[in-house]
Amino acid sequence: MNAPAIFAKEYSDYADQVGIDFKVDFTQFTPRATYTSSSLRRAYFRGMKWYIMLPFFVKSADLTNYAFGISQLMAENPAQAKDYDRLESAIDFMVGGSDDLMPVDYLKALDAAKNAPDKEAAIMDYLTKAHNPKIKDMQANYPTVGEVQSADVLLDTKGMRFFSGKFILDSYWTGQLTQGDEANKPGYDQKLPPMASSLEVMGLLGSDYAKSQIPKLDFYKPTNSRAIDKAMKDLAAENATYTDADWMKNLYTGWLWTIKGLFDWQKTNAKSLPPFMQSVAWQAKVLQNASGFWTELRHATILYAKQSFAERGGGDGGCDNRKVPEPPKGYIEPQLLAYQRLSYLAKKTDAGLTEQGYKLNNQYPLKSFIAMMDTVIDYSQRELADAKLNEKVVSITNTDPNDPTNSCTTNSIDGTSDWENIRKVLTQDISDALPVPVEGPVLFAKDKRAAILADVHTGQDSNYPPHILYEGTGVPYVIFTAVDDANGPRLTVGFTYSHYEFTKPYGGQRMTDEDWQTNFYKPGDTYNAFDYVAKSLKPAVNYWYKILFAGK
C-alpha cells in the first residue's frame, strides 16, 4: 500500500486479534472530504482516525490492561479529561453516540468491581455486558467459510477506542444488509451480499421509487434476493418503532429524519401537490435530491461516523415614467415537512453549540439560515393553499423635476413584492446563510465546487474481491417545471442535485474530492473553480435516474 511516511509502519502492520484475523483498514487514514485543504486539517484527520480506528480488545488481556492504564491516567488529569469530554460531547451532539467502549466505561468497571471478591472477574463481567458495538468496521479473515456468525464476529471487535467511531443509523443499515464469508444470519435461508446501495438506504428512509429499483442492482441475484428482501423488511419494522424523539436525538439522525420528510411529505400529500410533482419522474428527482443530500451528510461526517466494512442603482433624478415590468414569477418547491425539519435542525445546532460554551466566529450564518427558512416555509404554505401572491404597482403624478411646467407620472411597487422576495431577497438570504470558512474568505477551487465524494461502505467475500462503495455529487442539473396555479401558468427554472453511485477496488489511497472532481472540472488555476470538461467525459448516470433524461 502507498502510505504517508508517518504511517508507513502502521500501514504495513496489522493487529493480531482474538480467534479471527482482524485487520485495521489503513486506507481509512487517507485524508479526504473537508480535511485536504491544509496540512493542519490533514494531520488532524490522521491523528483522530488513529484514535478512532484502533481498538483495545476486551478479549486481549494486554490490550485491556493498556485500556485501563489510559483510562486511569485520564481520571488523574482532570483538566485534560475535561477537554476530552468537551470534544467528545460536541461530536456526540453532532454525529451520534459512540459505538464502542470508551475510557469512561473502563472507569465504571473499576468502580463496579471495587468491592467484589474477585475484582478481575467482576471487571471482565462488567465489560462483557457493557455496550456492544452494532457496526463492524474492521476487516476479518476467517479460517473457514460459512461457519462463523456475523454477530459473533461483531462481538469479537468489542473493545475500547480512545475516540470511538460514532453509531450512525445508515451505516448500521448497510451493515445489516451485507456480510462477508460468515454463515447465514439466523432465520435467513440465503447469504447476504457483501455490497450495499444508496437505494436501500433511501428505501428505508421512505422512498418507494428507490425500493422499486433495488431488484435491478447488479448484486441482487436469485442466490441472495430473499435475504436482501428479508433484511429490508426487518429493518423497516425496526424503523417503524422509532419516535420523532428518536430521530431528533442528535444532529446526524435529525438530518436523516429531514431526508425522510422529503419522501413522507410526497406520499402523504400526493393528491394536493401540483401535477408535476405527482409523476414517477418526480419521484426519481426527489430520490436524486435526497441521495445528494445524504452524500453531503456523509461527506461532512466522514471522519467521525463509523463506516460499515462490507447579491440597487440610482437614476439621474429626471422623470422616469416607465411602467413596472411584469415580475418574473418564481416558485419554491413546496417540500413543507423537510423545510420545517431543516429549520428545527438549524435552531438545535445553534442552541446546542451555545449551551456547550462554543463561541464560533462562523456561527452567525445559522441565524440567517433560520430566518430564511421561516420565509421559505411561509411561501410553501401559501403555494399549497393556491394563494395569489402580491405585487401592488402604484402610479404617482408630480411636477417634472426637470420641467416645472409639466407633470410626471412615475410607477413603482408599493410596499413589499412577493415576487421580488422570491427572486432577490431569498437569493441574498441564501448567500448570507452560507458558512464562512474558519481559515478565511478565500477558498481553493476544490472547496467552491458542488462535486464532492464520500466512501460509505467496504465489502468483500470469497467470491467478490474487496470493493469500496462511493457516493458522489456532481455539477448541479438545471431543472424546468411547468407550473399552473392561482398566479397563472409559467415555466420556472432552478437547480437540483446530480448524484452518482459507484464502486472501486479496495487498496491504496481512498478517493478524495480532488480525484472525483477531475470528472467534471478541468485542471488549472487553483482558484478557477468552474472550467468544465465536455459533457461526454462526465460519469454515466445511474440507471435509476435515467427516467429524468428520457431514458438516456
Give, region by region, the residue ranges found by the protein language model.
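Long, non-catalytic protein-protein interaction scaffolds
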Residues: 1-552
